[in-house]
Design a protein with these regions (language model features):
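GNAT-family acyltransferases
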Residues: 1-120
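Conserved small/polar residues in nucleotide/adenosyl-binding loops
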Residues: 128-130
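Phosphate/ribose-recognition catalytic cores of enzymes acting on nucleotide-derived substrates
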Residues: 125
Length: 130
């Protein structure tokens, strides 16, 4: 996550779960470590271009434990209102398809938003509106 701060009202409360269009968002947290790891690793080559060009995340040898630590960090940042990461599902919640990250930025924007879906669900990317 970049240094900086998201400009939020003092009393802001981010929804932990919400429906947006045909999708359901839920806080990204450690209870989904195994499925998140599977989806991340199956899509790792494309994911290395999402946050910055030729990123090293996720590493070829990333472990389940490292993934769990990432999810613990995302949950902590969410609770501290530093950043907001959501897991993304279709409305029926039958399949975890990706993530949305709302991160602080040093640029003159309120935040940076990143979205990714698994390679197997890439066709759904254009249907998610945030």
């Amino acid at each position: 996550m970049k240094e900086g701060k998201i400009n939020l009202p003092e009393n802001f409360i981010a929804p932990e779960n919400c429906k947006v269009g045909d999708f359901y968002f839920s806080i990204l947290e450690p209870s989904i470590t195994k499925i998140d790891y599977k989806v991340v690793m199956s899509s790792r080559k494309r994911l290395r271009q999402i946050f910055r060009r030729d990123d090293t995340w996720p590493a070829e040898d990333m472990t389940l434990d490292e993934n769990t630590k990432d999810l613990i960090r995302h949950e902590s940042e969410f609770k501290q209102k530093k950043a907001f990461a959501y897991s993304v599902y279709p409305l029926d919640k039958n399949e975890y398809i990706g993530c949305i990250y709302i991160n602080p930025t040093k640029k003159s924007y309120d935040c940076e938003v990143y979205l990714w879906v698994s390679d197997s669900n890439f066709h759904m990317l254009s249907l998610i509106h945030i």
